[in-house]
Amino acid sequence: MAAKPVVVGVDGSEEALRAVEWAAQEAERRKAPLRIVTVAAMPPRMRPSNEGPEGVANELLKSSTDALDASVARAGEVAPGLITDADLLSGQPDQAIADSGSGAQLLVVGARGMSGFVALVLGSVSRYVASHAPCPVVVVRHDADAPAADGEIVVGVRESMAASEAVAFAFEEAALRGADLVAVHAWHGSGGEQHATSILTETLSEWRDKYPAVAARPEAVSGHPGHVLADYSARAALVVIGRHGAPGAGHAIGSAPHTLLGHARGPVAIVPCES
């Protein structure tokens, strides 16, 4: 059976090309094909009337195909020999990109996109995708002082998360990279640290047996989960956090993931969790 693909959404911006680089490297690690997607959809205020102008639509179509071509070329530079295909999607950009994650191992988008009417995939759309896609979503941010790709994998641990999909994803990622894993629980209030330590011990005991080669350590930290994990992102190769609730069950992604996406200095994985 063929491996499920890694999917990346693009819009022609440099930020999108950096997301392509991240996705291509991840697909190579996972021995998976890479699928690059963009959306040919015109914002309502710019849709031509029955009389025209069709030139605007043609320009948008050309921009979309150019974005795909540039992305395929960049993926080939980063991971020569990687099986790559490109698809031009239709429909509402946010929903189309989120839906492209169906059957994928993960879906990658950039934190920001282009300005103007061709900004179809990234920026605000990335938050919609992170809260609605049926698979893990990685939002790639490349700041000037972004952490090295060979850093630790950090995962935020909530209470009763021993079987969490987010923890499973983090351990798998650490194993693929040969990286250390840091399990973090943010706490506050009297007795919070002791309770946090208990949660982390319970969580790691199960996953250490499944991934004995992964060096994992617990860290209980006082503070808001989103801000605590954002601080860790300064040195992490990837920060992983769970998204609770069914895909499409509302536009709110949750306080901690929302805060983390707004303040992280490196890539963030948002993993849908059933529990």
Name each model feature, range by range.
Residues K31-P33, L82, C135, A179-D180, ...:
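Short glycine/serine/threonine/alanine-rich loop segments
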Residues M1-A2, E15, G55-N58, A73-L107, ...:
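Structural beta-alpha unit
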Residues V109-Y128, D150, P218, L238-H263:
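Glycine-rich, Arg-bearing micro-motifs that act as flexible, cationic patches
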Residues S64, L68, V72, T197-L200, ...:
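N-terminal membrane-insertion helices
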Residues P44-M46, A96, P147, G191, ...:
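Generic structural signal for helix capping and beta-alpha/helix-loop junctions
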Residues M1-E54, G151-H195, T201-E219, L238, ...:
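Small/aliphatic-rich secondary-structure junction motif
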Residues D99-A144:
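Hydrophobic alpha-helical segments and helix pairs
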